[in-house]
Amino acid sequence: MRLFVGLGNPGSKYQDNRHNIGFMVIDEIARRHGFSPWRRRFQGETADGSLDGERITLLKPLTYMNESGRAVQEAVSFYKIGHGEVAVFHDEIELPPAKLRVKVGGGIAGHNGLRSISAHIGNDYLRVRLGVGHPGVKELVHGHVLGDFAKSERPWVAALAEAVADNAGLIAKGREATFANKVHLALQARGFLDDDNKKSGADKAAK
């Protein structure tokens, strides 16, 4: 059994924010794989299903980003799972738009959702880092992540969510490197990532 956690803030005010890309990806996994209807549990919403034969619970904390760890800890305690069975999907400003990185443990890079989760369950969980780009200067970061995706960004956001959902079973099987590679190739095939693996289609459109 694995717990997939998508990070974001609850409510319509925040639903299109860059900070909510974790919610968007988790919603897409639920849609594409026929998970159960969402229900209120663990200070959040959960949906149950399976990926490649592995039982999965999806969790969207409704505590607001800064308290996400409370919901995660409740779920981990209820299911009696180790940190290695937890995967957290979150926005990452240090990655270009449409880029993805997967890693276990490490720092929190100023992300308040990760800070809360690490404070509650420790650092040894999988992070699926979803690139949303950096505004260029530190002072603009807050407004950037709490700002909505522009209309021009929505195609790559949808493509990234679809690629993650299509390949999420690889995470359930512990094949994180293959997962990351397949997502990259899917985004590249649709023109949102350059062949040099450095720039996104969103970057090119902005020039």
Curated annotation (Swiss-Prot):
Which parts of the sequence bind tRNA? 14, 64, 66, 112
Instruction: Please indicate which residues carry the site annotation Discriminates between blocked and unblocked aminoacyl-tRNA.
Output: 9
Q: Name one GO biological process term.
A: protein quality control for misfolded or incompletely synthesized proteins
> Superkingdom of the source?
Bacteria
- Residues flagged as site, Stabilizes the basic form of H active site to accept a proton: 91
Swiss-Prot/TrEMBL keywords? Cytoplasm, Hydrolase, RNA-binding, tRNA-binding
Taking the first listed entry, what is the main subcellular location of this protein, grouped into a coarse class? cytoplasm
Matching PROSITE patterns, A to Z? PEPT_TRNA_HYDROL_1 (PS01195), PEPT_TRNA_HYDROL_2 (PS01196)
GO cellular component: a single term: cytoplasm
Q: Where in the cell is it found?
A: Cytoplasm
E.C. numbers: 3.1.1.29
Catalytic reaction equation(s): an N-acyl-L-alpha-aminoacyl-tRNA + H2O = an N-acyl-L-amino acid + a tRNA + H(+)
GO MF annotation list: peptidyl-tRNA hydrolase activity; tRNA binding
Name of the top EC class for this enzyme: hydrolase
Query: What CDD domains has UniProt attached to this entry?
Result: PTH (cd00462)
Q: Where is the signal peptide?
A: none
- Can the keyword Cell inner membrane be found in this entry's annotation? no
Is this entry keyworded Cell membrane? Answer: no
Q: Which residues form the active site?
A: 19
Matching entries from NCBIfam families are given as: pth
Task: Name the family.
Answer: Belongs to the PTH family.
Q: What is known about what this protein does?
A: Hydrolyzes ribosome-free peptidyl-tRNAs (with 1 or more amino acids incorporated), which drop off the ribosome during protein synthesis, or as a result of ribosome stalling. Catalyzes the release of premature peptidyl moieties from peptidyl-tRNA molecules trapped in stalled 50S ribosomal subunits, and thus maintains levels of free tRNAs and 50S ribosomes.
Summarize the subunit comment.
Answer: Monomer.
Protein name in UniProt: Peptidyl-tRNA hydrolase
Q: Which organism is it from?
A: Rhodopseudomonas palustris (strain BisB5)
